[in-house]
């Protein structure tokens, strides 16, 4: 093959399989608290190059212009002709001090290059030594100044040209004054902050007002209301907080025991319009980072999807079922508990399925179909299906969710817990991690545009979303390693015009948490993506993580999206998501109305999902193409609204499996997975299998089941052609269980 016949290579697929670095986990192992302020140079300096004029010595063709390397889009790139030397330069518009250059190389990179600056674009000064490039992200700390900055490549590493996804220059005077930051930020009108000196009657009145406005309301489930109640460190007198839709209660201490509430943080049935008799629609609420001394000894948290309890200390008992659970209709259906301590007994009662991770409990009583535990001290023994407990001694990889707290000086900070491996028990007190001052966050508020949010990211800030709805006419692009993107009070991102709402680059350590996505009325190919298709970079030491991220196709909006979440980056941690194509909403729903093929697409290798809820999509609901994937707890309901069998024929027969592992995957594990059918539009509809996986010894499923809810609709087998059908001859929503496959 001669050079003139070459075209740019496909994205690189090689991996560096480094594993655990001792220093990265030593502090956590020894139980030492590590608190440090983030010092990434780009967190203090501005991104100067994005969107500025760029030129190059050559381009391979018009598809790969110089401007593509400074457009903030990691899916476009500059590529040169196949010769040495070549350069790419950006005009910053005025002379700036330069502190850092970040190069995101495609597979065709430089084996020797320098970074140069110039005041006039003709006389150049080296501000870096001759440097070898690398496939993927490369960060150079430099010192210099100039209006023009260029990468001057002298030797290619491949027969191809030089190719950069992004060329980022940082420096200047720092933050944009139009994007103010503060260590005592305004969190907006939907956030109430209490102190121990606040009268209990004031707190009670505030939480009652929020809840009573939702009491048997026909609109609250998909309403615009958002309520966050934050408690500064201290002890609070009797507060009985009923928790409704889009409501969060959280402590502002560094540890849960820094905030003590006497009374209850209560979720029950009997109040939701049209569904008063059960708790199966108790969605979108949360409790975090506080302790409760429950009145009467037991706190009630009868929730279903998208209702996490994290970093909580229950100084008594905890029940997860509604108070009418013994009256024939009292069900709750699927919750999540992590990084918590329950001194007494956890009673699950009529809770149909539940996942508990890295916690300590006194004892667990009960279980209906699918109760899963990983890293839980005091968990029941593994006994699936009778009783239906699936228990793992540890969780393979964890990084707990970032949380807001107030330091001793009254300043606000975000604590980012460190990565743990083979973890068990709560990660507090003495949590290892990093404390970031709020001045390094842009505090987003409803009404902020995508351009304003991207400008904050471009100047090196993290993002903190306050409660409310954000309409986005462009994609929010997170490109800097270790960026924290978090929210409180279920901030909801709605794309318009079919754009993707959030794009996370294939770089180390980005953390996304506490966000809700609503599909817009114009179909989006994806609502959120992580990494770039076809690229496999080893992030094992510092993975990207997603926590409490929820997706809806259909809500108050008749949304459409082909795939809600696509994960391309290797080693990504998916810790508690709910991807939901709505079976009901504030706006009408239906088979041809709120359309969506797939909830989760995983192309990355070594991806771990802990607490995976995906429901009602129209084709394969989870597609797992990456190798060495692991899921601990999976909950699914098939689409209710299939009109007839002819409308729902998949590649291998009737319908689509809920959980599809690609035929070429050689290594995959799932512990504790349930898929349920309720084909109420046409009960004659059937799906041939709930789980579809290749028949290989390395692909292993443990504790999986199917249920026909109310015996409405048929799932013919659990896994491939194994397990038998539901409805069972026994009827009465009796599950089919497969303990191990193969």
Region roles according to the model:
Residues 1-43:
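Secretory targeting and sorting signals
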Residues 30, 44-93, 104-109, 129-132, ...:
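Disordered, acidic Ser/Thr/Pro-rich linker "stalks" and the adjacent N-terminal cap
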Residues 96-107, 151:
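A short beta-strand element within beta-rich, extracytoplasmic domains
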Residues 113-115:
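Short beta-strand elements bearing conserved aromatic residues within extracellular beta-rich modules
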Residues 125-142:
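Extracellular carbohydrate recognition and processing domains
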Residues 152-159:
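Short beta-strand-plus-loop segments that form exposed binding edges in beta-rich domains
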Residues 175-742:
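Extracellular/periplasmic carbohydrate-active domains that bind, remodel
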